[in-house]
Amino acid sequence: MGGKNLIEEGKKLGYQVTTIYSKDFVLFSNEFNIENDVNLFIQRNISHNRALITSFLVEQLGYPVINDHMTLIRCENKIFTTYILAKHNIPTPKTFIAFDKTNAMEYSKKLGYPVVIKPVEGSWGRMVAKADNLDVLYSYLEYQEFSTQKYKDIYYIQEFVNKPNRDIRIFVIGDETPVGIYRVNENNWRTNTALGAKAYPLKIDEELKELALKVKDIIGGFFLGIDIFEDKDRGYLVDEVNGVPEYKNTVRVNNFNISKFLLEKAVEWVKK
């Protein structure tokens, strides 16, 4: 859910909303202007590279954009996300970065199996793998080394959090946390809806709200999807932050109009 729904809701609110497709977006470096009268851009490109670059270009034109390119960098690069949050004492899964397979294997042993290896950039749970022992880890490391990943020689390795068969997705819009979901997967340890997890309504308690807003203050941005694990001993752990969050399943199970809420809050923000 994204551009089309935002346009429909914008019309209902009396706003003039249109979609600019990245495939049609061309900007010369010496011609910083857009013909239309624009107050705000909302980034909905599911391609990280295109989202990052188009947000950057729009900012150079002098327009506000949700989200700005620096927020997207901090969100979409898992190394940046994890280490920035950890520096600010946000609870996160234990993670290390290695630039060599030997070190990756050595420190995985110290971390303790099973471990999870993730691509530095990516979404929907793609290429996220659990290694139960050294042999399995070596296979994953070797596969990554010869893949076409952008960061194929940088290894992002994380503890396996023994969470319930679910995780939490909370949406932050402006300074509010209006809605969230549980993502439950009975058949896979990965709880992405793209991998078969089902969405269920979430009642956001004060602890979750406070944590999500702290993350927003650290990462920046206006519209975020924050993924949180529940650990029986440590409580809530922030796993990832999405700078262009999808929300179709959240709307469906909560009967909450995210597009309308986002547009109203965005207009308030621009007017300030």
Language model segments and positions:
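Conserved N-proximal alpha/beta basic substrate-recognition cap immediately N-terminal to
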Residues: 1-94
